[in-house]
Amino acid sequence: MAQKLTLEEKQGIQRMLLDYAARYASQAKAANSLHGVTSPGTFNAVVNGKFERISDEMFLRIKAAVGSGKSEGWQICQTSAFKDVETLLADAQQYQNVSWIVAPAGIGKTTAAFQYSKTHKNVFVLGCSEDMHKADFVEELAKKIGIRNEGLTVRATLTRIVDELVKMNRPLLVFDEGDKLTDSVMYYFISLYNALEDKCGIVFLSTPFIQKRITKGLKLDKKGYEELYSRIGRKFVPLSGVTEYEVNAICRNNGLSDDKAIASVIRESVELRNSQMEFDLRRVKKSIHKQLRIAAAPRL
């Protein structure tokens, strides 16, 4: 049987929810963005400290939806790539421009985007997937922004999204793993851009695969590709890779100080590609966890 949450743990989740709500124009919009996770009534009860009728399961669902997204106790290290993503997001939000950031998987793009959204208002990060249809894309975007779209058509929902965004102070849309979107969904970006030009920043994050896809689409004169390429400024913004020095810093920030253990993490996490050392931060994290467990094991 699972252990019951303490009052202190519930208050911690309440603080997470309050921090989450502070990123929206109103608590009502924050509650709408959690549609499917919790009801407005439950949202208000937790915010106001009325915990009596809220189940532990609901508290944990709220925590999963609004929490930091990082493992308990894991310290994020601001690598060069992390800082570059934050700088590009800040520029897009400040000047309402559009860019497409590309870097290999596991470099920390998503983490940087979510960390930025936690400390800046009107920033909405939408995770993209290959099975997203137009209706899914628009519905998820509406939910992120805090719009209830029951009874609305896809086109009407898109209009509501645009109307809501243009009323905000420097809104920013971040489409994570944008290369996974199908062509039909990408066409919606063109419609969004046309309606939001100079009114909303837009940033895509993806692997470099998108460059090949766009180049091929341009050669084949595929519908929408020329307009899409034009709207991202006809270029992709690459990020620098994670260095051995940064992996060392991540190890030390997360409690691993033994030089031999750190060397093991580096060996297990490195991959040679085009004669260059590349590190996947997911592998780094897994290897650090392994070394910490080895260090904590009782010695016979």
Feature locations, PLM:
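Mid-core helix/loop region of P-loop NTP-binding domains shared across ATPases and GTPases
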Residues: H133-K134, E139, R148-Y188, A195-G201, ...
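Walker A/P-loop nucleotide-binding motif
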Residues: Q94-Q115, S129-E130
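A short helix-turn-beta junction within AAA+ P-loop NTPase domains corresponding to the substrate/partner-engaging
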Residues: K121-V123, G217-S240
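Conserved catalytic segments around the Walker B and adjacent sensor/switch elements
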Residues: H120-E130
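C-terminal alpha-helical "lid" subdomain
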Residues: M1-A64, S68, E72, K235-L300
